Amino acid sequence: MVRIMLMHAVRAWRSADDFPCTEHMAYKIAQVAADPVDVDPEVADMVCNRIIDNAAVSAASMVRRPVTVARHQALAHPVRHGAKVFGVEGSYSADWAAWANGVAARELDFHDTFLAADYSHPADNIPPLVAVAQQLGVCGAELIRGLVTAYEIHIDLTRGICLHEHKIDHVAHLGPAVAAGIGTMLRLDQETIYHAIGQALHLTTSTRQSRKGAISSWKAFAPAHAGKVGIEAVDRAMRGEGSPAPIWEGEDGVIAWLLAGPEHTYRVPLPAPGEPKRAILDSYTKQHSAEYQSQAPIDLACRLRERIGDLDQIASIVLHTSHHTHVVIGTGSGDPQKFDPDASRETLDHSLPYIFAVALQDGCWHHERSYAPERARRSDTVALWHKISTVEDPEWTRRYHCADPAKKAFGARAEVTLHSGEVIVDELAVADAHPLGTRPFERKQYVEKFTELADGVVEPVEQQRFLAVVESLADLESGAVGGLNVLVDPRVLDKAPVIPPGIFR
């Protein structure tokens, strides 16, 4: 289907310039959010897939420390008519439920992605919108509408504005998307959505140090924080509060001081009035628990190991890939931590040399076993790991940024040099699970991912109840969206780490 997208020029303006509110980027996004277009059936189906996907990775992360911390914080904020915290009974303040559920969905780096000018994980919009829907008794159809908008705005901003070039974390696109999505879901007026978007962006701009060097657990908290901030921004705007404006284009705004500066013009595509919002269909989930740009290399490594045979005969491996892959998870980052056997899990899942080495040795990837400290410290793994490097290839960079989804690629070409001098070469453009891959994810694969990761965590009866609720999401009446919560076996939660008390109790 050909989409009618309007390309908006976005640049900095001086305060003295004649720049009416209706030309502000936040206003144009609010127009899209307030446009009551119908949701295409395949788009609604994909929303359900991504809700299942988030539940899968949330179940797998339930007893990890960051998730346990966030859950404890949320449980300190019970309310009578609130939202659900993943895994447990009770009713809690929507902002804190979104916080806990956002950390659970993001902790394992295992849900959906969209890559273009910048990076994004648009399923990070799901926890805050579901939490607000649960607290306010929103019906399933309106939740779907809101999520479709959130995905659209998040992906369109990611297409048009590069944040990482200026060392700004990609959650700066998430905050406005959450605000816009909630605005659609609650059918708020355009002015209210405009101010909510401005506040959300203003408060979710932070540096990329969260994904550089020794990466900490904040990587999982960052999108949850943006979601929480987005909820609070909408709440204030609904009560009549305004926002810094123009937030992107102002003389002291985001573009002028945090991004490319007053001389640069960004071009952001947005749906034309009356145009269905379909951007979610351009995003893709993960089969492997690791940074998305390592998905195709993992599949490539699993394929290559049979051709190589004795891995001890490897002298070197060079992965030719895109600029983004090279500098974010490859040796172009200059991060020595990416070669440290004692590095955190968060650091290792952003180390393509480590990931490729383990996938090559094991022929598979596991969200826990592949990151185990004893796995990372294996002497043969460390030896192989240090033989792997990345280089930027202009052709892979071009394909990474290609506007044609059929030609867009996030893979690599591997050149494996053996001690004998023989060179083995293979390449893979997209991951097997990608829509254009050899085993693309459809509903069946999303359900299989959920049942696999929920095994031993969620009782089978509860798994089936949850899946049935998701299947009927579009028909859920007001108050029934609480059924999207998944209850976890209490014996599993008993295995969670003991967390020292904080301020919230």
From Swiss-Prot:
EC nos: 4.2.1.79, 4.2.1.3
InterPro entries listed in its UniProt record: 2-Methylcitrate_Dehydratase, MmgE/PrpD_sf, MmgE/PrpD_sf_1, MmgE/PrpD_sf_2, MmgE_PrpD, MmgE_PrpD_C, MmgE_PrpD_N
GO molecular function: 2-methylcitrate dehydratase activity; aconitate hydratase activity
Disulfide-bonded cysteines: none
Catalysed reactions, semicolon-separated: (2S,3S)-2-methylcitrate = 2-methyl-cis-aconitate + H2O; citrate = D-threo-isocitrate
Disruption phenotype: Cells lacking both prpC and prpD are unable to grow on propionate media in vitro or in murine bone marrow-derived macrophages infected ex vivo. Paradoxically, bacterial growth and persistence, and tissue pathology, are indistinguishable in mice infected with wild-type.
SUPFAM superfamilies in the record: 2-methylcitrate dehydratase PrpD
Pfam families, per the entry: MmgE_PrpD_C, MmgE_PrpD_N
Keyword Ligase: no
Leading EC class: lyase
Domain of life: Bacteria
One of the GO biological process terms: propionate metabolic process, methylcitrate cycle
Family: Belongs to the PrpD family.
Subunit structure: Monomer.
Function: Involved in the catabolism of short chain fatty acids (SCFA) via the tricarboxylic acid (TCA)(acetyl degradation route) and via the 2-methylcitrate cycle I (propionate degradation route). Catalyzes the dehydration of 2-methylcitrate (2-MC) to yield the cis isomer of 2-methyl-aconitate. Could also catalyze the dehydration of citrate and the hydration of cis-aconitate.
The name this protein goes by in its record: 2-methylcitrate dehydratase
Organism listed in the record: Mycobacterium tuberculosis (strain ATCC 35801 / TMC 107 / Erdman)
